[in-house]
Design a protein with these regions (language model features):
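Non-heme Fe(II)/2-oxoglutarate
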Residues: 1-30, 48
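Catalytic core of non-heme Fe(II) oxygenases with the double-stranded beta-helix
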Residues: 43-113, 123, 132-135, 139
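Amphipathic alpha-helical surface "interface" segments used
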Residues: 1-5, 37-42
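Hydrophobic, well-ordered secondary-structure segments
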Residues: 12-22, 100, 106-107, 128, ...
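A short beta-turn/loop motif at secondary-structure boundaries
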Residues: 32, 129-131
Length: 146
């Protein structure tokens, strides 16, 4: 898409770049970044996004524009094969470092970044309001290292 070329998205893109460089800093990564691509997602009732990754990108993420109730959480999965081979019963309140999947409730104005290699998806939108009221609208993006 040409979203990154449109003036109405300039303030969002400026914030995305700030956050992308913060991610680089946190991970000890040097070098310039470019916005590889960005696109809008419109998810009506019963839509979802299967687990996937973003090859050839550095950072990926989502910015939530419209979020009706029960419209589906973003989930991030542990990519290591080992934790899938044995899933022992865990006590309640276990440390986050031991979680296999982390889920984030969408909220309007929330911006989430993650490494592009991290498997992720979106749970089913269970909001059944009529028409466009049930749409979850977000912008997704990929940053590349230049």
């Amino acid at each position: 898409t040409d979203m990154d070329k449109r003036k109405e998205y300039k303030p969002l893109i400026e914030e995305l770049f700030k956050m992308a460089y913060e991610c680089n800093k946190d991970y000890g990564i040097e070098g310039k970044l470019g916005l590889g691509n960005m696109w809008a997602n419109i998810n009506p009732t019963y839509s979802y996004n299967k687990t996937h990754t973003h090859p050839n990108s550095m950072w990926s993420g989502v910015y939530y524009i419209k979020v009706p109730k029960k419209s589906g959480k973003l989930f991030l999965e542990d990519p290591r094969p080992g934790p899938n081979t044995h899933m022992p019963r865990r006590v309640e309140g276990m440390p986050e470092a031991l979680w296999r999947v982390c889920a984030y409730e969408p909220a309007e104005g929330r911006m989430i970044f993650f490494p592009s290699w991290l498997p992720h998806g979106v749970d089913i939108n269970m909001n059944t309001e009529k028409g466009e009221k049930n749409w979850r609208i977000s912008v997704s993006y990929n940053f590349i290292q230049l």
